[in-house]
Amino acid sequence: MPTVTISPTRCKTALNRTGIPGYRYCLNPYMGCSHGCHYCYADTVLRFSNRGSRWGEFVAPKVNLPEVLRREVRRKRGPLGSIILSTVTDAYQLAEEKFHITRDSLEVLSEEWPDARVDLLTKSDMVVRDLDVLKRLKNCSVGFSLAVPDDKVASELEPGAPSPSARLLAAKRLIGEGLKVWAFIAPVLPGVTDAQGMLGELFSVLKGAGIEEVYVDPLNPYRASLERLKAVYRAKLSWALRSLETYLSDPRGYLRTFSRELALVSKSHGYDLKLDHAR
């Protein structure tokens, strides 16, 4: 793993409007992400950060975000609206162990607006640490993002993230504590997520963890992340390269085929899923 540069910073705003359906605000406690997922679209923030580091090699903790959040929430009139953590970072990346910005922000929400809908999406089992705070939020859920169930394959694609098996253990723990937990199969990596038997195994482990709510999202071929992803496919996942090339040349056709497979495999494991993007 490359060295990650940590550069604490201060923010002017905490809650930012988001265009993600179902949410009014996003909350991003960090700029950058040490998970370094090769397919991540969030490296577009580099264009605005004046940082020369490559994606996955810098993290800027927004050290004053909890206090800014408290001021913003107190100024709100009427319902706060739904909040997603996070959209361009992982709120539970390694830096959170030291800076606890995510935990402090959740504390603020639990104190100032405990009825607010708060959904967390993470690749980290660290979220279990904050069980006590999550339980104080009356309308909170935790989503775990997984592209594959295989720890070794995942380590090639998500070198700084906790393993899928660690995430699933965390999901099972949260469910056992009464929290609402869901899974986000994202992105669908051509030739990998849908490799022979892989999709069935993924649904099997999700079911085994007790997860009943699942969402699916295809790969977004942003230029910068696509170059990184292609390099990983060539070096580590050569058996899937042809599928990636097929997807890039005809994404609609590929997704139509995948959507049919998704419907069949998910149904065989007790889910009922389709890919809206394939219509």
Residue ranges: model-predicted function:
Residues 1-10, 16-17, 194-279:
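Auxiliary Fe-S-binding modules of radical SAM enzymes
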Residues 1-34, 38-143, 151-152:
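Conserved Radical SAM active-site core
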Residues 25, 83, 118-120, 142-144, ...:
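Hydrophobic faces of well-ordered beta-strands that scaffold small-molecule active sites
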Residues 69, 101-105, 130, 166-171, ...:
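A general structural detector for well-ordered alpha-helical segments in enzyme core domains, enriched
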Residues 84-94, 124-129, 140-161, 188-192, ...:
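Conserved radical SAM core fold
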Residues 99-102, 135-147, 193-212:
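Short, electropositive alpha-helical surface patch
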Residues 110, 135, 171-177, 263-267:
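Surface-exposed amphipathic alpha-helices with a cationic face
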Residues 160, 173-195:
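Conserved strand-turn element in the central/C-terminal portion of the radical SAM core barrel
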